[in-house]
Swiss-Prot record:
Cross-link (Glycyl lysine isopeptide (Lys-Gly) (interchain with G-Cter in SUMO2)): K148, K151, K274, K275, K305, K339, K342
GO biological process, one term: double-strand break repair via alternative nonhomologous end joining
Name of the protein described by the UniProt record: Abasic site processing protein HMCES
Role, per record: Sensor of abasic sites in single-stranded DNA (ssDNA) required to preserve genome integrity by promoting error-free repair of abasic sites. Acts as an enzyme that recognizes and binds abasic sites in ssDNA at replication forks and chemically modifies the lesion by forming a covalent cross-link with DNA: forms a stable thiazolidine linkage between a ring-opened abasic site and the alpha-amino and sulfhydryl substituents of its N-terminal catalytic cysteine residue.
Domain of life according to the entry: Eukaryota
Similarity-based family: Belongs to the SOS response-associated peptidase family.
Residue stretches of biased makeup (Basic and acidic residues): 295-307, 336-353
Residues where Phosphoserine is found: S160, S294, S321
Source species: Rattus norvegicus (Rat)
The record's note on its domains: The N-terminal catalytic Cys-2 residue forms a thiazolidine linkage to a ring-opened DNA abasic site. Glu-127 catalyzes reversal of the thiazolidine linkage; self-reversal is favoured by duplex DNA formation. Glu-127 is also involved in sensing abasic sites in single-stranded DNA (ssDNA). His-209 stabilizes the abasic sites by forming a hydrogen bond with the O4' hydroxyl group.
Gene: Hmces
Site, Required for sensing abasic sites: residue positions: E127
Key words of the record: Autocatalytic cleavage, Chromosome, Covalent protein-DNA linkage, DNA damage, DNA-binding, Hydrolase, Isopeptide bond, Lyase, Phosphoprotein, Protease, Ubl conjugation
Active site (record annotation): C2, E127
Activity regulation (record text): Formation and reversal of DNA-protein cross-link depends on DNA context. Catalyzes formation of the thiazolidine linkage in presence of abasic sites in single-stranded DNA. Mediates the reversal of the thiazolidine cross-link in presence of double stranded DNA.
């Protein structure tokens, strides 16, 4: 399943990260609808608003179905036929939609038949693994493997954000297949909401959870899913399957509380700092070896922090993906990415300042 995500990029940066080629092969930036409803966050939960990609044809009859817009929608689909005046009175959970029952439940079958397909945007999503023999659960942050060029991140200023010809070479957003619908209350404005489609977990995630989002890996998959004018429902559903091209790392339990919205939510955590080394044997030797390979911790429950106030980590904390990935590059990029966020944050908003 998928019950928590991160999508913290500023609006302009998110726009650039979603640049695409139109049907004529021209690079385009998606236009926004209701941009003021977008609230960046490291810790998004159901019933909050999240940005989704969808075809412009849903709103403009003369538009090309390959043209895209970004639209912040409520997470948790409210069916168009819902009769109550308050969406919170919906008696069933629609934050996720199982791929194997998508054509059996009217809440999802009806909007899917109308071509209401969308792509949910996120830095990545969180999942919790139940620790054996305890009631505790360890959170993980799951995302696309990241590559990093030498120029990456150097052109993230406002000038480059307005240049649609400049290729985005920073964090690769996770693109998840979704279904949306439009509900009209007795009074008030229309409510657009979505559900994330889920599939069986891939081999690399099966130890964490049995389900995962249906991830659209690559521009072709995203384009086909969105283009309901040219791609039929039957063809689009062929894109819904587990993928192995993901990586993940453990994170702090601070993410457990959805009210916590800081970079610490997705920063890699060292699980070993919570374990006491044994007095003798291989475990002690392993702990001694790790102590020579990684910086000492200030306190037992948290990673050491550098001058920027953010936790330090190394690629040893990134978990294995079934396919070869550049884990060092992913960790290094995430490190620099979070440090840049800290540097760009207004001084007045920083804690203890």
């Amino acid at each position: 399943m998928c019950g928590r995500t991160s999508c913290h990029l500023p609006r302009d940066a998110l726009t650039r990260a979603c640049a695409y080629l139109d049907r004529q092969g021209r690079r385009q930036l998606p236009q926004w609808r209701d941009p003021d409803k977008y609230c960046p966050s490291y810790n998004k939960s159901p019933q909050s608003s999240s940005p989704v990609l969808l075809s412009r044809l849903h709103f403009e009859k003369d538009a090309d179905s390959s043209d895209r817009i970004i639209f912040p929608m409520r997470w948790g689909l409210v069916p168009s036929w819902f009769k109550e005046s308050d969406p919170s009175k919906l008696q069933f959970n629609t934050s996720n939609c199982r791929s194997d029952t998508i054509m059996e439940k009217q809440s999802f079958k009806a909007p899917l038949g109308k071509g209401r397909r969308c792509v949910v945007l996120a830095d990545g999503f969180y999942e919790w693994q139940r620790c054996q023999g305890t009631n505790q659960r360890q959170p993980y942050f799951i995302y696309f493997p990241q590559s990093k060029t030498e120029k990456s991140g150097e052109n993230s200023g406002s000038d480059s954000l307005n240049n649609k010809e400049e290729v985005w070479d920073n964090w690769r957003l996770l693109t998840m297949a979704g279904i949306f619908d439009c509900w009209e209350p007795p009074k008030g404005e229309r409510l657009y909401s979505y559900s994330i489609i889920t599939v069986d977990s891939c081999r690399g995630l099966s130890d964490i959870h049995s389900r995962m989002p249906a991830i659209l890996d690559g521009e072709e998959a995203v384009s086909k899913w969105l283009d309901f004018g040219e791609v039929s429902t039957q063809e689009a559903l062929k894109l819904i399957h587990p993928i192995d091209n993901i990586t993940f790392h453990p994170v702090s339990p601070v993410v457990n509380n959805s009210r916590n919205n800081t970079p610490e939510c997705l920063a890699p955590a060292d699980l070993l700092v919570k374990k006491e080394p044994k007095a003798s044997g291989s475990s002690q030797r392993m702990m001694q070896w790790l102590a020579t390979k990684s910086p000492k911790k200030e306190v037992p429950d948290s990673p050491k922090k550098d001058a920027s106030g953010l936790p330090q980590w190394s690629s040893q904390f990134l978990q294995k993906s079934p396919l070869p990935t550049k884990r060092g590059a992913s960790s290094s990029l995430l490190d620099r990415w979070l440090k840049q966020e800290k540097e760009d944050e207004p001084v007045a908003k920083r804690p203890n300042s």
